[in-house]
Amino acid sequence: MPFPVPDPFVWDTSFQVFYFELDEKHRGIFQALFALGNDNNPSNLKLLYRVTANHFAEEEGFMQTANYGGYRSHKVLHEDFLAKLRSFKAPVPDKDVYFAKDWLVQHIKTIDFKYKNLL
């Protein structure tokens, strides 16, 4: 069963992976998506892509350093999501903003939670 998308769309402790740097980056993606949802313009779309790509690179670095077994499949999910974000054009349709919010929630709570205590 999918996890609910919070409304308002803000990070809370239910999303903690317990690695400070990664939690802060997740919080930043939430903030960027919230901004895009409230002011749907090219600048906020670029911000969302930038903070997401930066976070994915950092998270993947943690995984590689720890020889995390799920690294390759996790990286593919990141690449697919970044490709989807690159396909967006501002103003982004509401359904696509919701898709990104839902993807982030499900990804953190099902995929990222698998690396807790392993990095």
From Swiss-Prot:
Protein residues bound to Fe cation 2: E59, H74, H78, H107, D112
Keywords, sorted A to Z: Iron, Metal-binding, Oxygen transport, Transport
CDD domains (UniProt xref): Hemerythrin
SUPFAM superfamilies: Hemerythrin-like (SSF47188)
Keyword tRNA processing (UniProt): no
Family classification: Belongs to the hemerythrin family.
Lineage of the organism: Eukaryota, Metazoa, Spiralia, Lophotrochozoa, Annelida
Recorded coiled-coil stretches: none
Protein name: Hemerythrin subunit A
GO molecular function: iron ion binding; oxygen carrier activity
Keyword flag Iron: yes
Gene3D superfamilies attached to this UniProt entry: Hemerythrin-like (1.20.120.50)
InterPro entries: Haemerythrin, Haemerythrin_Fe_BS, Hemerythrin, Hemerythrin-like, Hemerythrin-like_sf, Hemerythrin_metal-bd
Transmembrane segments: none
Binding-site positions, Fe cation 1: H26, H55, E59, D112
PANTHER family: BACTERIOHEMERYTHRIN
